[in-house]
């Protein structure tokens, strides 16, 4: 596969969506993408037609029909399997770039550390759902829990975002562990939006600039 797969990860309110929109405009004009390559923007859950339906079930279930933790985990795995097979892998095989708001790291952080489900089980499901696909580069937008809570209070929340501070603290710990273990690129997300955008641009130039590409 000659395309590039980029992922933004982080706790609620870290600014992933804002930075995704910025990169959607910046990357195609950056000179980093090969001629003819397109940029596919996507998210998890919800990157495919099936994923949109699964996203609604997971985040906004009807009435009191919230899925149990294990069922929730399996719904995320189903979304990812469809996402990889239907969108991500085909795009990469055609030489395009894919930029995703969340990927498998979020499942480990939220369902593993947050829900305290078995990490080994989650990693086994990750291998099945992704068929071994690993992002070329993952950015961790690191945000203090206190700031996340402040930002969350200023907007409407889905079922996961409405969880309490203890849950969010465990999730933040999970992201920190994953960033270290998986060599993610950490970026301080409690800066001005423009500063975070500039840091993202610098890192992308560092990893995918002409010199780096010639060494691959």
From Swiss-Prot:
Keywords: ATP-binding, Kinase, Nucleotide biosynthesis, Nucleotide-binding, Transferase
GO cellular component, one term: cytosol
Function: Phosphorylation of dTMP to form dTDP in both de novo and salvage pathways of dTTP synthesis.
EC numbers, comma separated: 2.7.4.9
Reactions catalysed according to its record: dTMP + ATP = dTDP + ADP
Full protein name: Thymidylate kinase
GO terms of molecular function: ATP binding; dTMP kinase activity
Enzyme class: transferase
């Amino acid at each position: 596969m000659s395309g590039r797969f980029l992922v933004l990860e982080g706790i609620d309110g870290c600014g992933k969506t804002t930075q995704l929109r910025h990169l959607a405009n910046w990357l195609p004009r950056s000179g980093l993408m090969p001629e003819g390559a397109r940029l596919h923007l996507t998210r998890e859950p919800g990157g495919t037609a099936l994923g949109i339906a699964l996203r609604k079930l997971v985040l906004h279930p009807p009435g009191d029909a919230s899925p149990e933790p294990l069922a929730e985990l399996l719904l995320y795995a189903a979304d990812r399997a469809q996402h990889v097979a239907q969108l991500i892998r085909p795009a990469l095989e055609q030489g395009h770039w894919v930029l995703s708001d969340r990927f498998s790291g979020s499942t480990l952080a939220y369902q593993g550390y947050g829900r305290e489900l078995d990490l080994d089980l989650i990693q086994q499901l990750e291998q099945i759902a992704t068929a071994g696909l690993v992002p070329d580069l993952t950015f961790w937008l690191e945000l203090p829990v206190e700031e996340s809570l402040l930002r969350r209070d200023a907007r409407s929340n889905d079922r996961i975002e409405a969880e309490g501070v203890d849950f969010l603290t465990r999730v933040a710990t999970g992201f920190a562990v994953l960033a270290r273990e998986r060599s993610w690129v950490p970026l301080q997300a409690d800066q001005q939006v423009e500063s975070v955008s500039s840091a993202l641009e610098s890192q992308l130039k560092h990893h995918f600039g002409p010199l780096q590409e010639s060494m691959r």
